[in-house]
């Protein structure tokens, strides 16, 4: 069990709200939580929060984690994929596995924690966050975010 996994069930209620504005056209506000206000004041924690805000500005995720994807959205996309003509000739159980893989790929770009980390694409945002948990010795949770782009409505 890694350090990050051991700390994963600990309560993270402190932290900070980080904001980032890119070229006056894209704005991001993100809530990043940790266990103590001491860690929230550390430069490493502040840097993590800032880098996550930059990630959100650059990559436009819709959800923090897979758990945040609404069931209706998941079912809608799954139904579209299942209706694909290229899957019609495949056996049922093979179609299920193919669709599961396609679903994972479809949502990987929309889920912040699954995205390739922009400053080191050899790891995901989730892996980068786990490294910070191990380094800082506390559970860290990216709770929520809002991304606003000039001239673009939701």
Regions found by a protein language model. Give the residues of each.
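N-terminal assembly/interaction segments in proteins that build large macromolecular machines
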Residues: 1-154
